[in-house]
Regions:
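Alpha-helical adaptor scaffolds
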Residues: 24, 43-88
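Amphipathic alpha-helical segments of tetratricopeptide repeats
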Residues: 36-42, 76-83, 116-122
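Boundary/linker segments of alpha-helical solenoid repeat arrays
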Residues: 45-49, 84-90, 119-132
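TPR/TPR-like (Sel1-like) alpha-helical repeat modules
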Residues: 102-125
Length: 141
């Protein structure tokens, strides 16, 4: 992993913070456009940048909050793209995969993903999430 130049990182952070403000204002479409803009600012290959993973997770979290599964899948794939190179957040990625599978109604795959997370990291990834995910997991164990 290479560290981004400070000025570029500050520019990306500003775009990401604006995306978050747009989300808080209820404008998911504009929010996602700014997340996309932040993503496009990373030099290729984007999977070399730890910060690119952060941009993707911010976007996927906004998509989950809005139950926008189509866009969540795009950003989840980007999280995986970066993580496949850096291998830093396997449990976090698996937890988000479980949430996506749950929301898509693929409950067997959701349970499998959540079970892997719990075996790797315990239940800490459920702490700041809607209780439906942990309740689902506990109900299947």
């Amino acid at each position: 992993m290479v560290i981004l130049e400070n000025t570029l990182q500050a520019e990306i952070d500003a775009v990401s913070m604006h995306a978050h403000r747009l989300y808080n204002a209820g404008d998911l479409q504009s929010c996602l456009e700014f997340h996309e803009r932040a993503w496009s600012m990373y030099p290729e290959p984007r999977n070399n940048w730890n910060e690119a993973y952060n941009t993707a997770i911010y976007a996927v979290d906004d998509c989950f909050s809005a139950l926008d599964m189509k866009n969540a899948k795009t950003w989840l794939d980007r999280m995986a793209y970066v993580n496949d190179q850096l291998h830093q957040r396997d449990e976090e990625l698996m937890h988000h995969t479980g949430k996506y599978k749950y929301e898509m109604g693929d409950y067997d795959a959701a349970f499998t993903a959540f079970d892997k997370v719990v075996k790797m990291a315990g239940k800490r990834y459920f702490e700041d999430e809607p209780s439906k995910y942990l309740n689902f997991y506990i109900g299947r164990t």
